[in-house]
Amino acid sequence: MKPEDFRASATRPFTGEEYLASLRDDREIYIYGDRVKDVTSHPAFRNAAASMARLYDALHDPQSKEKLCWETDTGNGGYTHKFFRYARSADELRQQRDAIAEWSRLTYGWMGRTPDYKAAFGSALGANPGFYGRFEDNAKTWYKRIQEACLYLNHAIVNPPIDRDKPVDQVKDVFISVDEEVDGGIVVSGAKVVATNSALTHYNFVGQGSAQLLGDNTDFALMFIAPMNTPGMKLICRPSYELVAGIAGSPFDYPLSSRFDENDAILVMDKVFIPWENVLIYRDFERCKQWFPQGGFGRLFPMQGCTRLAVKLDFITGALYKALQCTGSLEFRGVQAQVGEVVAWRNLFWSLTDAMYGNASEWHGGAFLPSAEALQAYRVLAPQAYPEIKKTIEQVVASGLIYLPSGVRDLHNPQLDKYLSTYCRGSGGMGHRERIKILKLLWDAIGSEFGGRHELYEINYAGSQDEIRMQALRQAIGSGAMKGMLGMVEQCMGDYDENGWTVPHLHNPDDINVLDRIRQ
């Protein structure tokens, strides 16, 4: 049974309930040494799953459906999330940006690998299926399937960080490669990372990152899609922040960790059968190398990522402001200046999303893609911005972030609460419970293990720091922008030579130059 078969109607996306039901498919998820029987009820995953289900319910809610959805283009007469159907104009890209933002606000920007993230991949399949050569029909089929149901895909495209100085074909015992061709498909084995939130997805796309050395062995030159319950495919998860928050605290203590933890995992494939209809690239080095720059995903996912980050910075900026209201620090000029810098970062990323659709360009199949210049700026600047914002919060909120009781149970102890009401009260008449609630929220955002993981996530979201800068340079050269910049400099240098100005509208200083008079 396919995940989309859990829907009561084939003309609409999953509801939240149908989405949760589709995850109960005997997938192999392991955490703390045990196999998870049901990710929708296991305390390591259940609130994250419920948060994801809420996104699906929003697609059907009359209050949000119009903002989030439009008609499919597959001929099924249904509707879908706007980012699951490729845009045919700059204005449609704007509508997609707004739909991404609307969905992201339901998690306050804290879940990055929501279904619309990989919708960037699905949309590109429909706009440019010819990129996949002999697997073009597979691309068309997957575009239709992903769009009509709003299937939840994730990807695992990074090889485990082992012998990174060697081409992949020299680490054959670790990296995913073809074992053999069999009747109806291929058998593959190996591992990929970091399969973020894959425990809660329907399918995983397995491919190659943009900066990996592929070597000469075509066994590694492949890309495919696999259902999460494929026999032989396993996820080995990192510790669950949701579970730890439940064991050692409460929603009051860990309001973000408790519900928005996207568990990262090692994806292991042990002789997994992949039918030909799920293969997109096979033994083709050139297509693997060109997939990121030419396949479309590399131009679409940054709009989802930048919009999601902008929503997240709305939240972080608001939480910072409230925290400073707690401490009474907002009246200080220096603090106001630092908060203003955080606001400027927030404004920058919203402005980049405007530029992405505002300077869009037409691509294959009548599709419009976001501005390459704007998305490259986002990919380079976001990893710089997030640590700077975190540092600012640590500086201006300072000890307020840890000047807190251990947990909500301290508030329930009358002997302790009477002290907390005095020594942990907020400024300007704010009660101690409100102050503690605000500062615990901000600590969970930046200081808890959940918060630390988010900093790592944002720093490495787009990949290697060197590579994203080199891609920005290559884009400037390839687009002709660098030629224009050089031309401006050359034009300036052409305005003068060693004898003075070469343009007729300027005056040489022969009549006033003192050095010439002295020399005479």
UniProtKB/Swiss-Prot annotation:
FAD binds at residues 155-157, 196. Its EC number is 1.14.14.9. It comes from the Bacteria. Keywords: Aromatic hydrocarbons catabolism, FAD, Flavoprotein, Monooxygenase, Oxidoreductase. It is an enzyme of class 1 (oxidoreductase). InterPro entries: Acyl-CoA_Oxase/DH_mid-dom_sf (IPR046373), AcylCo_DH-like_C (IPR036250), AcylCoA_DH/oxidase_NM_dom_sf (IPR009100), HpaB/PvcC (IPR024677), HpaB/PvcC/4-BUDH (IPR004925), HpaB/PvcC/4-BUDH_C (IPR024719), HpaB/PvcC/4-BUDH_N (IPR024674), HpaB_gammaproteobact (IPR012688). Pfam families: HpaB, HpaB_N. The keyword Disulfide bond does not apply. It catalyses: 4-hydroxyphenylacetate + FADH2 + O2 = 3,4-dihydroxyphenylacetate + FAD + H2O + H(+). Pathway: Aromatic compound metabolism; 4-hydroxyphenylacetate degradation; pyruvate and succinate semialdehyde from 4-hydroxyphenylacetate: step 1/7. Coiled coil: none annotated. SUPFAM superfamilies: Acyl-CoA dehydrogenase C-terminal domain-like, Acyl-CoA dehydrogenase NM domain-like. HpaBC can provide a biocatalytic synthetic approach to the production of hydroxycinnamic acids that is an alternative to, or complementary to, conventional methods such as chemical synthesis and extraction from plant sources. One of its GO terms (biological process) is phenylacetate catabolic process. Signal peptide: none annotated. GO terms for molecular function: 4-hydroxyphenylacetate 3-monooxygenase activity; flavin adenine dinucleotide binding; oxidoreductase activity, acting on the CH-CH group of donors; protein homodimerization activity. Oxygenase component of the 4-hydroxyphenylacetate (HPA) 3-hydroxylase. Catalyzes the hydroxylation of 4-hydroxyphenylacetate to form 3,4-dihydroxyphenylacetate, using FADH(-) provided by the reductase component HpaC to activate oxygen. To a lesser extent, can also use reduced FMN. In vitro, has hydroxylation activity toward tyrosol and various cinnamic acid derivatives, catalyzing the hydroxylation of p-coumaric acid, caffeic acid, ferulic acid, and coniferaldehyde. NCBIfam families: HpaB-2 (TIGR02310). Homodimer. HPA 3-hydroxylase consists of a reductase component HpaC and an oxygenase component HpaB. Some form of interactions between the reductase and the oxygenase facilitate the transfer of FADH(-) to the oxygenase in P.aeruginosa, although interactions are not required in other species. This is 4-hydroxyphenylacetate 3-monooxygenase oxygenase component. The gene is hpaB.
